Amino acid sequence: MPELPEVEAIRRGIEPHLVGATILHAVVRNGRLRWPVSEEIYRLSDQPVLSVQRRAKYLLLELPEGWIIIHLGMSGSLRILPEELPPEKHDHVDLVMSNGKVLRYTDPRRFGAWLWTKELEGHNVLAHLGPEPLSDDFNGEYLHQKCAKKKTAIKPWLMDNKLVVGVGNIYASESLFAAGIHPDRLASSLSLAECELLARVIKAVLLRSIEQGGTTLKDFLQSDGKPGYFAQELQVYGRKGEPCRVCGTPIVATKHAQRATFYCRQCQK
């Protein structure tokens, strides 16, 4: 599933092609996604794109009459293509632009979403989200406060969108390794100093991945069709049995809440 860096990489890739251009119309070939494509999207006509934003893993296209909310689901991608390029099997939604280009949504598993809202504030998919990890609101003091009474392992707690958004499975594993914190540690056992370090490395890991265009393990592609290159820099994720790049100890894989967790028994305590 695309996580925050992948979604942010796509946002940065599509923004220059959309802002200042006008959506002439939408083409919905298959509206049966995780939730049905909103009826308002079918009727889009002559709508200039004012901004392309991101909240958590949602892309937000600002139009004069409202907002398009896009979620990529498990296997979705967005690409900027020439309008004349014919669609393929899993190309479900196009936004045809005034500049001769098309924003094309591809999703083999159809678990993404295209929603419409007049106002973002209070929308049910956005209403209960925690702070952005790259914002000043997410810091060691905040993390320590939220962990203080939490009797659960730190790894799944980091992946809870009510604590902080966008730190999915890959980046939770990578950040805990960078901070030297074992994923099974109770959240409440973390000191303020550990929380300050963890908050810093989460930001650093996410920013580095964004610079590399995200992580491609299977389906993810950037808006130009290229893979994300952060996969080349993964320290623990997906490396079960391989030697730790720091100490040489074999990387261990376990599961938390049915999600794979990777760590080094020597480097993480």
From Swiss-Prot:
Keywords: DNA damage, DNA repair, DNA-binding, Glycosidase, Hydrolase, Lyase, Metal-binding, Multifunctional enzyme, Zinc, Zinc-finger. InterPro entries: DNA_glyclase/AP_lyase_DNA-bd, DNA_glyclase_Znf_dom_DNA_BS, Formamido-pyr_DNA_Glyclase, FPG_cat, MutM-like_N-ter, Ribosomal_uS13-like_H2TH, Znf_DNA_glyclase/AP_lyase, Znf_FPG/IleRS. It catalyses: Hydrolysis of DNA containing ring-opened 7-methylguanine residues, releasing 2,6-diamino-4-hydroxy-5-(N-methyl)formamidopyrimidine; 2'-deoxyribonucleotide-(2'-deoxyribose 5'-phosphate)-2'-deoxyribonucleotide-DNA = a 3'-end 2'-deoxyribonucleotide-(2,3-dehydro-2,3-deoxyribose 5'-phosphate)-DNA + a 5'-end 5'-phospho-2'-deoxyribonucleoside-DNA + H(+). Its EC number is 3.2.2.23, 4.2.99.18. GO terms for biological process: base-excision repair. Binds 1 zinc ion per subunit. A zinc finger (FPG-type) spans 235-269. GO terms for molecular function: 8-oxo-7,8-dihydroguanine DNA N-glycosylase activity; class I DNA-(apurinic or apyrimidinic site) endonuclease activity; damaged DNA binding; zinc ion binding. Its cofactor is Zn(2+). The active site is at P2 (schiff-base intermediate with dna), E3 (proton donor), K57 (proton donor), R259 (proton donor). Belongs to the FPG family. This is Formamidopyrimidine-DNA glycosylase. It comes from Escherichia coli O6:K15:H31 (strain 536 / UPEC).
